[in-house]
Amino acid sequence: MTEKIEGSKFLDSMILGSLLGDGSIEMPTGYAVNPRISFTQATWEKDYIDYKHDLCNELYKTNNVREAHNNTYRFGISSKEKILTESMIAKTRYENNTRKLPKIDEINPVVILFWYLDDGSLTITETKRKNRKNSLSRKLKISLQSYKDDDILKFISDFKKKYDIEFKPQYETIKGNKKIVSICLNNNLKEIIKFMDLIYPYKNLIPECMHYKFCICYKKTLQMKSDDYSKYNNCDIINTGICTCRKKDFSHLL
């Protein structure tokens, strides 16, 4: 049974997951003397950042959500919350302030949930197959562009041991160097379902504007025959063939 994470542990796990995603630790500038934790989301994710703000405000001194540049909203936790900030710096930063991934003992389903909601995606596309009916392909991806390759590979190994979910590194060539930019579960529905099993218990706590990230467009196949996985649909694809989350019509494939 998955551990139930709640209270202050849920909040601190949300903050850690956000720092792996769209959150940041701002170093002091001007008259400021202490770093602080801040959160940023797109304007259409306003309910989501309000939710994060309300959680943080229950335990930490937090400023109001405000409009920022490039169609975003943001807020920060007071720099006076030194114990929290120092703890998060220790978990997510090297001494030179470059990013590091937390130890696997610090990773739990709530950390994974907010990391995925911030920096993850689940794309569903039509795959053409020769002499056979086309099918749905799924790719779950979490961006990791600011981390060392060795740290990412170690994280993949540790995550596999802890949760029996095997991410694959995805590389891109950047300025002539091959670099890991994300980890993914590519066209492996069983692994994607195991990932969803981890985070789904918390879905109803999350604003509806983010529920599309839980939608796997599941329908029974010869290999996957259970009806249970249809709970991971945030659309009525089983009856209509249409994924309203992605505004795509897959009826000709089903």
Regions found by a protein language model. Name each.
Residues 1-254:
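Internal intein/HINT superfamily modules and their associated LAGLIDADG
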